[in-house]
Curated annotation (Swiss-Prot):
Changing residue 81 to A: Does not affect centriole localization. Does not affect interaction with RTTN. Residues 59-80 have a biased composition (Basic residues). It comes from Homo sapiens. The keyword Disulfide bond does not apply. This is Protein phosphatase 1 regulatory subunit 35. During centriole duplication, plays a role in the centriole elongation by promoting the recruitment of the microtubule-binding elongation machinery through its interaction with RTTN, leading to the centriole to centrosome conversion. In addition, may play a role in the primary cilia assembly.
Length: 253
């Protein structure tokens, strides 16, 4: 009896496990590409629902519910494709169509020929042609401006020619000019002083005074017992020191 019960329980458990085990999972559906354009990359990602493993011991109802959830989770598993946008295909530049060379037009030099004939028949004015060429030429104008500026900016002391250049050079003038230049370079010599003339007679000093008007006064003391008078110097201004000397020099001049 114990063996039979054990076998029946094993068979029932095996039957429940066989009923709980689902069939094989469905194959993922791969989308078919319509255009044969190669894609730059595919992102193959699975999004399974994480289920924590639980032990098998428990009631048969719980085992059956767990098996159904596993089968539903397996059915919900699918492959997801994330397609990046296709890269723009660079169009290769088409080869340029060879163009035909332009052909010369008939009678294209007719106007030039007429101008040449008119120039040949007209009178040639050399002065006018030179003036026009000088006015149009940039190099000639620049050269003239440089020469004019050099002539205007040179100081008079450095000018080479002060007068017109003559072919008939006078020898005496050239030699005299060279001699003057050499003498100007020599150091100045000490000159002898000029002889002085003998001085003339001096002026008469009695012109400024009259001898008849000169008087001399002296004190006359009649009282006895007075002390004798002492002479006292009277101060004079300092500018009168050389007054007589300056007066004599002025008279000599």
């Amino acid at each position: 009896m114990m063996m039979g019960c054990g076998e029946s329980e094993l068979k029932s458990a095996d039957g429940e496990e066989a009923a709980a085990v689902p069939g094989p999972p469905p194959e993922p559906q791969v989308p078919q590409l319509r255009a044969p354009v190669p894609e730059p990359g595919l992102d193959l990602s699975l999004s399974p629902r994480p289920d924590s493993p639980q032990p098998r011991h428990g009631s048969p109802g719980r085992r059956k519910g767990r098996a159904e959830r596993r089968g539903a989770a397996r059915q919900r598993r699918q492959v997801r494709f994330r397609l990046t946008p296709p890269s723009p295909v660079r169009s290769e530049p088409q080869p340029a169509v060879p163009q035909e060379l332009e052909m010369p037009v008939l009678k294209s030099s007719l106007a030039l020929g007429l101008e040449l004939r008119a120039a040949a028949g007209s009178h040639f004015d050399a002065a006018k042609a030179v003036e026009e060429q000088l006015r149009k030429s940039f190099q000639i104008r620049c050269g003239l401006e440089e020469s004019v500026s050099e002539g205007l900016n040179v100081p008079r002391s450095k000018r080479l020619f002060r007068d017109l250049v003559s072919l008939q050079v006078p020898e005496e003038q050239v030699l005299n000019a060279a001699l003057r230049e050499k003498l100007a370079l020599l150091p100045p010599q000490a000159r002898a002083p000029h002889p002085k003339e003998p001085p003339g007679p001096g002026p008469d000093m009695t012109i400024l005074c009259d001898p008849e008007t000169l008087f001399y006064e002296s004190p006359h003391l009649t009282l006895d017992g007075l002390p004798p008078l002492r002479l006292q110097l009277r101060p004079r201004p300092s500018e009168d020191t050389f007054l007589m000397h300056r007066t004599l020099r002025r008279w000599e001049a």
